[in-house]
Amino acid sequence: MDRNFLLTVTLICIVVAGVGGQSPISSPTKSPTTPSAPTTSPTKSPAVTSPTTAPAKTPTASASSPVESPKSPAPVSESSPPPTPVPESSPPVPAPMVSSPVSSPPVPAPVADSPPAPVAAPVADVPAPAPSKHKKTTKKSKKHQAAPAPAPELLGPPAPPTESPGPNSDAFSPGPSADDQSGAASTRVLRNVAVGAVATAWAVLVMAF
């Protein structure tokens, strides 16, 4: 352990001496950091105190920085062309005034003569007809006349048309003016009478209640 420590210390001294012998311009401003030597010893061996050597300080030589020369200003060209004069714009020519045509007054339209209104002819007074006594009597008779009861013949079928052909001599059926021998007409009349009686009885019952 002592030999290793001494070797490291001598190497550090050699490096410091080599760095100090360099030129001040190319020498670095800061010295390189030296690795620290191990100071711990094994537990069994007695602790050996090694002399601590202070590292030599490198002389900080002020590097002479070159002085920069001031920059010369760019030459200003004195012969600059004069500014071109701006041409003055002539005033605008006023537009000629167009005289508007004088409007003549409108010609009045001729008024058409309206035809005279027709004069209404006088209406002749027509004498009112005198009331007749016959009309009064008919009105009174109509008021007092009662409505006739419906006949049983009205409830039956309508009569045959008048334009039906008359009976021929060859026809076997009797004509309408001949007597009905079959009895169908009598049954029809009886049926009509029965229907009329039922209708009147029904009307009487309705009026009673």
Swiss-Prot record:
Region (Disordered): 21-185
Keywords from the named record: Cell membrane, Glycoprotein, GPI-anchor, Lipoprotein, Membrane, Proteoglycan, Signal
Residue ranges, compositional bias (Pro residues): 80-95, 103-119, 149-164
Expression sites (tissue/organ): Predominantly expressed in flowers, and moderately expressed in roots, stems and young leaves.
Bias kind Low complexity: ranges: 23-79
Post-translational modification: O-glycosylated on the hydroxyproline residues.
GO biological process, alphabetically ordered: megasporogenesis
Transmembrane spans: none
Signal peptide boundaries: 1-21
Cross-referenced InterPro entries: AGP9/17/18
Lipidation (GPI-anchor amidated glycine): 183
Compartmental location: Cell membrane
Topology within the bilayer: Lipid-anchor; GPI-anchor
Composition skew (Basic residues), residue ranges: 132-145
Annotated propeptide span(s): 184-209
UniProt GO cellular component terms: plasma membrane; side of membrane
Family of the protein in this entry: Belongs to the lysine-rich AGP family.
Entry function: Proteoglycan that seems to be implicated in diverse developmental roles such as differentiation, cell-cell recognition, embryogenesis and programmed cell death.
The name this protein goes by in its record: Lysine-rich arabinogalactan protein 18
Origin species: Arabidopsis thaliana
Native organism taxonomy: Eukaryota, Viridiplantae, Streptophyta, Embryophyta, Tracheophyta
